[in-house]
Design a protein with these regions (language model features):
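Intrinsically disordered, low-complexity RNA-binding regions enriched in Gly/Arg/Ser/Tyr
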Residues: 1-42, 48-82
Length: 82
């Protein structure tokens, strides 16, 4: 299941996201959307978790929590309309 993660600090790295999500199960991939400024992200990204039950638990427990002073949004990723 692909999970959207928003409200991240721009200087966060994938290891920081992994630390939060691996508590809930297996992670297939983590993608932080890069900013034009090297070494920074755009404040959002995606986590892929193959087990739907683990993914749903991560979403319900991580959505709305505060990390490093910022409230994050965690939800099921949806396809963008073209």
């Amino acid at each position: 299941m692909k999970i959207f993660v928003g409200g991240l600090l721009y200087e966060w790295k994938t290891e920081m996201i992994k630390e939060q999500f691996e508590k809930y199960g297996t992670i297939s991939s983590i993608e932080l959307i890069p900013d034009r400024k090297p070494g920074f992200n755009k404040g959002f990204g995606y986590v892929e978790m193959p087990n739907e039950e683990e993914a749903n638990k991560a979403i319900s427990e991580l959505n709305g929590i505060e990390l490093n002073g910022k409230k994050i949004t965690v939800s099921i990723a949806t396809e963008r309309k073209k």
